[in-house]
Amino acid sequence: MTYFSEIVHLSDIARVHGDRCPDKKAFVFEDRVVTYKEFNTNSEKVANGLVLENVAEQDRVAYMDKNSDRFYELVMGCAKSNSVIVGINWRLAPPEVAYILND
């Protein structure tokens, strides 16, 4: 089996990298370094948390914040729980945010 044949779904990326190169750096953000193993583990925790909060498949999960490596853990967590991430630009005006949330 080739490396790429193991990646079928977006959520497989964290798992495959976590298995193949667990100690390699996945992200460096400010003073925080996250390995692929940690990235996979953290995204699993996010997915489990979403399920525990009764976020159903295809439910939308809105995220609005400034840049952070944690965003990618949320993206993977949503993929693993089959929910949909909705990134909202933090610079939008309140009516624009309301429009996105109500759409």
Residue ranges of predicted features:
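N-lobe entry segment of adenylate-forming
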Residues: 1-34, 38-53, 57
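Conserved AMP-binding/adenylate-forming
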Residues: 32, 47-95
